[in-house]
Amino acid sequence: MDTLFVEEVAASLIREFLSRKGLKKTYVTMDQERPRSDLSINSRNDLRKVLHLEFLYKENKAKENPLKTNLELITRYFLDHFGNIGNNVTQETRIPELSVPKKSNKLPLRSSETTLVNIYHLADEDETWRTSLSEISKARHDSLDGDVLGHFVSSKRSSHKSRPIKTVAGESPTVASAWEKTDKLPMSEPSLDTKRMGEKVRPKSGLIVRGMMAGPIASSPQDSLRKRSLRRSPALSSATQPHKEGSPQEPELSTHTSTCPTPLEGPASSTASTSRSPQGPLSELTWEKQRTSPGSPPHLPGKGLLPRGSGRWRDLSEDSPAVDSGSEAIRTPPKFSLSSGNVPKTQERPERAFERQGSQPASLRKNQLSVSNKLEGDLDVLQLEDVEDELVREEIILSPVSSVLKLQVVSKPIDLSVAKDIKTILFGSSFCCFSDEWKLQSFSFNDSVSLKYGIVQNKGGPCGVLAAVQGCVLQKLLFEGDSSADCARLQPSNARRTHCLALAIADIVWRAGGCERAVVTLASGTQHFSPTGKYKADGVLETLILHSLTCYEELVTFLQQSIHQFEAGPYGCVLLTLSAILSRSTELVRQDFDVPTSHLIGAHGYCTQELVNLLLTGKAVSNVFNDVVELDSGNGDVTLLKGISTRSDIGFLSLFEHYNVCQVGCFLKTPRFPIWVVCSESHFSVLFSQQLELLRDWRAERLFDLYYYDGLANQQEQIRLTVDTTQTVPEDRDNGLVPPLELCNRTKWKGASVNWNGSEPIL
């Protein structure tokens, strides 16, 4: 994650605290000593979304004395959940890091060589963690206390609440002596990767006895390609076995160790080569490529499935890359050992992708074997892993099978010539810059319960881009996916609408690239060239990285990892516009224009028809009629006016057609989905229906409902219009008092009456 971005988010947290507490002088002083940048967040809602504090915010609002600032919410969260851990665990307990919602809450324990057995009961997240004395005495002679990571036992829960582990009071002298012996081990500080991999382990729901194995399970070759749950950690060994009083033993050295597989070319390439691709985080995104549904079997690498009672991987979720043990691990028979030990992960484990930010600093790649290097030569330990079968859908993401290659993404920083060309296409001159309305506009959603599907517009200007994206998001919400009820489609969860936003952006840029390629522009926070000559810097274009993809599925995967930049911003609207232009290419965009000197952003930062057409149809043509119109000037010169060449997914209606200024063709007026971008009074908004039959069955057009959404109108409630085509309205009626939206509506349904159903008509 970019350090500069982290600093700006932290500074925004402090500014919000000072503002809400009325510390005006301190607030002004901070602005003077640390001025804001383009990455600063000025909206409390945006700040909550960036830090994923929506759950804590809603929980706080329900309290009698709610806290006023996000900083206090975070502070109370830490105090409530981690303030008393020190009373229940040993002195080496580490303070957990702040976790993102739906990600692992680390609850570290010191590694031990005792035979203490922890039993976790997670059937109900509101029950506390319990330890059974009877199970301890039963399993002391043959169980392991060291976890697979050597230092940490983590559990992931969908709730934001964590409970401390209750340890057994009055440990025996044997247990105490084992603690002392563990302290004497030359253990190095766990690496960052080891800490992260601690998030991946979660006990099974129900009663799990750690360290007790159910035995090996025979599996078919097909299973071995799907799940390598039973495998030994290559080149790693466990710590020494626990010493019994009066009979000290020297640990035996393992005589058989497996080696790390050599990275292979093609589909069988190992994760080591993938995680160390020069493209950094881009290549790692393949681990997040496949999502699963509750009914689909998880395709995990492993030797077979373990019984339900064995230890299991909990976190096959948004931050869990696959672990491919390689062909060597398949050929090596498992060696069973009950020696206690700390078995860190192998070097094959890729660095976890920063999916919400879409980037990963190279500095985070550290040696993943810093712990294991101190322990070589000890006994090998069979690593028990299993698959969680009771996960919530939003937390599930399938690890890819071995046939899935890494993302084929070509990335390069923008250069001066490309930036000049883009500005000329956008503004007509390379001296123009994006206005603040454009820079601060992203695709953040409405917080109102009845308008959760809606994208909020801060100020005028980029309304054409927002309306086009809104239409594509509605297409995904209403007519794709498995939402069974209309109300569920229009009241999506945060994860669902974010997913639909990523799909909508993917459709827009893929369509602009002729369904053959796409270019996604992302801000890096670092200036890549020095502006010289006839070019004026705006702080946005100079920081872009251009990511080119030629596969739609990989494009969707890539956007799901980087959707944070589009949704939370601050340049989401700019990034999408530039992505569409570069996907189409500046040369083809210029060829789409009727006049080569046209541009996509007009006066006062308004969107032109060319820009809206580019987002809706993939071509930046200047007109809305069908096909091409030839104009003969009379002297033999023929001027070609380019229109819409094919039927569009999202439609378009214009008030200009009511005034006979233009004519909207049937390719836009009758789209594939009943969603229309409406141009009225130099502003773009959206009109849509939930009935797909409206465009397929003429009988559905007799009486139907349309929903209207305007992201700029500070709309608080859903506006539903009932259109009746059986009751016609005279066209000679005084148009001065007729809402423009009704006039736009009648360009599609001639003379139809419109009932606003109690909503105030928008004039």
From Swiss-Prot:
Chain intervals with Basic and acidic residues compositional bias: 180-202, 346-355
Active site per the UniProt annotation: C463 (nucleophile), H683 (proton acceptor)
Top class in the EC scheme: hydrolase
The protein's role, per its UniProt record: Probable hydrolase that can remove 'Lys-48'-linked conjugated ubiquitin from proteins.
Modified residues (Phosphoserine): S143, S220, S224, S296
Key word Protease present: yes
Low complexity biased stretches: 267-278
Species of provenance: Bos taurus
Gene: MINDY4
Signal peptide region: none
Protein name from the UniProt record: Probable ubiquitin carboxyl-terminal hydrolase MINDY-4
Alphabetical list of InterPro entries matching this protein: MINDY-3/4_CD, MINY3/4
Reactions catalysed according to its record: Thiol-dependent hydrolysis of ester, thioester, amide, peptide and isopeptide bonds formed by the C-terminal Gly of ubiquitin (a 76-residue protein attached to proteins as an intracellular targeting signal)
Any Gene Ontology biological process: proteolysis
Entry similarity comment: Belongs to the MINDY deubiquitinase family. FAM188 subfamily.
Alphabetical keyword list: Hydrolase, Phosphoprotein, Protease, Thiol protease, Ubl conjugation pathway
